[in-house]
Each structure stands twice: as structure tokens, then as C-alpha cells.
Amino acid sequence: MADSTPVRMPRAPKLRASCDECGAAKLKCDRGHPSCGRCISLGLKCVYGVSRKAGKPRRDAQSATRPPPTPGDSGPPLDYNSFGPTSPPSSVGDGATLASGLLPGAADLSPLDWGPGSSSSYRAVVDLCSRYAKEPMRMDDTAMSSVWDGFLEPSLFATYGSPVQVARLAGGSVPFSAAPVRDLPI
């Protein structure tokens, strides 16, 4: 009994438009075959290598390697650990960048929520933490202290303790430092 599946011949690899020598020198190749004009004049071996561009795979090859999507499949789950910041903030204005790296959704806060003299920043950060934490975040959590470290006036720490305590006691009228604490001379 004969197999009804058509036999496909393998495609010949696609060659580069420019020869390897002109490509390496980043010069325009005249694409002459079997040798381009530049290679002939310089006495070089003219080779047209395989193209590095793969192109689009054929449609039937795509469907064979990937299962069909199931209804209600929203894609792979997001890994929120991959959103972390690459460096500590360098100024007060970078607080939103830090928080958006730590908390998905913090980037939605306006710049006014993070500037000096802000009164709603603390509540916004606690709200975001509570939304994305598996358990509601305690107000004195050390993770919150690390978010606010460097943004509150240093004199407040001596009187009230942690940044979280300062923010809680101030009730939304927390004085902010013009420069992060870590940048102030000791």
C-alpha cells in the first residue's frame, strides 16, 4: 500500500547576497559570480556563505511543533521576581522606578506621588504591597522599610525609629529629604 504523504525535498540553503570577504570588510559587494570584482582585483577567494537570516518557518512545520491553544489559556504565568531593579535609586525621583521594580503596578503612580513633600506615597506603596502579597503586609514590615530607606529626613529616624514608624505616626504628612539619606555626609 502506498503512503499518501508527499515527499518533500530538502531546500538548498540560502546564500548571502554579499561574499564573505566584502561582508567582513563591510564594503558593498558587486555580487558577481563565481567571484565578485573586489575579490578578483585583490586576488581573494570569493565565497558566498550561508545566509544568517533564517526567514519564517513554513506553516505546516509550525503547527507540527506547537500544540493548539486551549480555550481560556492566557499564556505563561508572569514571574514577578524578574522585574527587580538593576541598581539602587540615585535620587528621590527614582523612587517610582525602585517601587515599580519591586511592585507591579507602582509605575501607574504619577510622579507627584513620589516627589519631595508627597503625602500619599506611603499609602500607595502599602496598598500595592497588600494587593500583590500573598498575605496582607504588616505596616512595620522590613520590606517596606527598605522601600522608604533614603527618602525620609534622617532626623526623624532618631526620634521615631524606622521609616515605617515615621510614616505611620505622621499620618500622611511625612517630610521628605531632598536627597537620599545614603548620599548625605555622615
UniProtKB/Swiss-Prot annotation:
Pfam families: Zn_clus (PF00172). Residues 19-46 bind DNA. Residues 52-98 are annotated as: Disordered. GO terms for cellular component: nucleus. CDD domains: GAL4 (cd00067). The keyword Calcium does not apply. One of its GO terms (molecular function) is DNA-binding transcription factor activity, RNA polymerase II-specific. This is Transcription factor pgmR. Gene3D superfamilies: Zn(2)-C6 fungal-type DNA-binding domain (4.10.240.10). Its main location: nucleus. Keywords: DNA-binding, Nucleus, Transcription, Transcription regulation, Zinc. The lineage of its organism: Eukaryota, Fungi, Dikarya, Ascomycota, Pezizomycotina. It comes from Aspergillus terreus (strain NIH 2624 / FGSC A1156).
